[in-house]
Amino acid sequence: MIIVSGQLLRPQDIENWQIDQDLNPLLKEMIETPVQFDYHSIAELMFELKLRMNIVAAAKTLHKSGAKFATFLKTYGNTTYWRVSPEGALELKYRMPPSKAIRDIAENGPFYAFECATAIVIIYYLALIDTIGEDKFNASFDRIILYDWHYEKLPIYTETGHHFFLGDCLYFKNPEFDPQKAQWRGENVILLGEDKYFAHGLGILNGKQIIDKLNSFRKKGALQSAYLLSQATRLDVPSLFRIVR
């Protein structure tokens, strides 16, 4: 369900809305779901719809970029824009344009390798650039460190549930992973459509394919399969909207 300024948005309320055709299915799905989305204004709602579609597009762009998967300790990037911290974070160099540095990852992917959690943050930034434009992005995010979302300035939250939406970040957990290959303890993914996910390092796959891949990296004698957690990680759109408007 969608609540705008304390008022429930009903299906009949949007019948005459003039919005991009590709936003309609997502809008209707959000209205009909039991998951509650709260906004201060219609502008915030439209911002979320566009941002989610751009997250999907950004995930597909990163998939095609040639950027590779690497553990945090083996992270690397284009040294024109980024330095790598001892922890494996990509830190934006002083006076480098943030939007140009982020776009470089998509345009020159073979110069980059990073963890799947880092990939999610990069996807969020790529989507934001396409949603708000380079000038607003550069003004709002002048100091960027790409690591994971627990280290991030972006307002991000995770909540439990079984209802997922385009652009959600989900997690496939591998509880009996091989300790020698700990990077396969799980996989962060972006939901691209019904049973279609982008998983950095694996590609665009369905849920069974991701689970089969993770199961191939279990410890010897493992009995428990990898599985999709009942939770979603999302951008806090009302908070983000106040940052970038």
Swiss-Prot record:
One of the GO BP terms on file: sporulation resulting in formation of a cellular spore
GO molecular function: protein-glutamine gamma-glutamyltransferase activity
Keywords for the protein's UniProt record, in alphabetical order: Acyltransferase, Sporulation, Transferase
EC assignment: 2.3.2.13
Free-text disruption phenotype from the record: In cells missing this gene some GerQ multimers are present, indicating that tgl is not essential. Heat treatment for 20 minutes at 60 degrees Celsius, which maximally activates the Tgl enzymatic activity, causes cross-linking of GerQ in isolated yabG-deleted spores but not in tgl/yabG double-mutant spores. Additionally, the germination frequency of the tgl/yabG double-mutant spores in the presence of L-alanine with or without heat activation at 60 degrees Celsius is lower than that of wild-type spores.
EC top class, as a word: transferase
Residues annotated as transmembrane: none
Catalysed reaction, written as an equation: L-glutaminyl-[protein] + L-lysyl-[protein] = [protein]-L-lysyl-N(6)-5-L-glutamyl-[protein] + NH4(+)
Superkingdom classification of source: Bacteria
InterPro entries per UniProt: Gln_gamma-glutamylTfrase_bac (IPR020916)
Family: Belongs to the bacillus TGase family.
Reported function: Probably plays a role in the assembly of the spore coat proteins by catalyzing epsilon-(gamma-glutamyl)lysine cross-links. In wild-type spores at 37 degrees Celsius, tgl mediates the cross-linking of GerQ in higher molecular mass forms, probably in cooperation with YabG.
Protein name: Protein-glutamine gamma-glutamyltransferase
Primary gene name: tgl
